């Protein structure tokens, strides 16, 4: 689920000296939008290969292509390095090592997603689950449940995991870049009983989300790459960072339970970790500053998970205010 559709600069080779960056300086010519390769045509091709090729073969091909991509477009690779630097104390060599792992991990993540959306059996993809008691307690409360997650691991797999346990999940997404990709991915989720709530086309979409949460539904929201209209400044790894204030806005509107969650790949399977709910005093959320503080608390709750799995924190556009 790519939550930052915008004009891409990919395709213009970044000058070699732009790949030399330090945490205190702004590198030149970093790509600000999603890759031109991320579109319906490539996604359909990936779904086709997922049906035709063995998993291991497809993952080997995907890994080779992703590593080639990182070489051909050094600006994209440098973007990831810059995103990782604050989490490793500004150590360039460590950030580059994490970045190399991240590109390899991303290729496997995408193949897993293609296989899922192609309708292939994925029963053996899930591993450890922690914090399930937090989710069950939230369900018993009768309030809506908002699952808040970063772009970490394979966040899309939270929906089929809950479906396996008899729970329905509504997934919030922005319109995907290009023509037809939103509908393609929406249809794939629908075949698995997962409903997609697309923000950006229908001005009443946010009202529909509020209505569902008020009715006790479970909704998933990505917090760490918001559109400008819902971005608020918080701190992550000691840096200024834009996070989505939408979770706090929905808490104010519906009194929903906020559950931070993340799904990293560990030992060949995806673990699901549900953290304790982030508590709040609803009347105070009338103040925007209080909503910003609540957003900060949600981000802070997820920060240790991101730090522990940096090689699976998938951001290919700049995430820091200084960039």
Place the predicted regions along the sequence by residue.
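Non-catalytic C-terminal accessory region of glycerolipid acyltransferases
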Residues: 2-4, 17, 34, 53, ...
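Membrane-anchoring hydrophobic helices of lipid-metabolizing enzymes
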Residues: 3, 10-149, 182-186, 193, ...
């Amino acid at each position: 689920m790519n939550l930052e559709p915008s004009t891409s600069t990919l395709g213009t080779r970044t000058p070699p000296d732009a790949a030399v960056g330090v945490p205190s300086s702004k590198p030149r010519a970093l790509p600000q939008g999603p890759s031109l390769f991320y579109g319906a045509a490539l996604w359909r091709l990936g779904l086709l290969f997922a049906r035709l090729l063995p998993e291991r073969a497809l993952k080997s091909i995907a890994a080779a292509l992703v590593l080639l991509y990182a070489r051909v477009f050094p600006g994209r690779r440098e973007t990831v390095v810059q995103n990782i630097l604050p989490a490793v104390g500004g150590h360039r060599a460590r950030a580059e090592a994490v970045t190399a792992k991240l590109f390899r991990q991303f290729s496997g993540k995408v193949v897993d997603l293609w296989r899922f959306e192609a309708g292939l059996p994925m029963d053996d993809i899930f591993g450890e689950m922690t914090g399930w008691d937090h989710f069950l307690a939230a369900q018993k409360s009768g309030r809506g449940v908002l699952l808040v997650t970063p772009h970490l691991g394979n966040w899309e797999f939270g929906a089929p995991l809950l479906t396996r346990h008899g729970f329905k999940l509504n997934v919030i997404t922005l319109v995907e870049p290009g023509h037809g990709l939103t509908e393609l991915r929406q249809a794939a989720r629908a075949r698995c009983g997962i409903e997609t709530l697309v923000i950006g086309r229908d001005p009443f979409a946010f009202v529909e989300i509020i209505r569902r949460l008020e009715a006790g539904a479970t909704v998933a929201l990505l917090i760490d790459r918001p559109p400008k209209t819902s971005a608020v400044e918080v701190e992550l790894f000691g840096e200024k960072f834009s996070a989505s204030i939408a979770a706090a806005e929905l808490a104010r509107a519906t009194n929903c339970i906020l559950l931070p969650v993340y799904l990293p790949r560990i030992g060949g399977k995806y673990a699901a970790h549900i953290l304790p709910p982030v508590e709040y005093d609803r009347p105070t959320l009338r103040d925007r500053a209080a909503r910003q503080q609540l957003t900060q608390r949600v981000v802070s709750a997820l920060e240790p998970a991101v730090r522990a799995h940096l090689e699976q924190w998938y951001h290919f556009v700049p995430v820091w205010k200084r960039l």
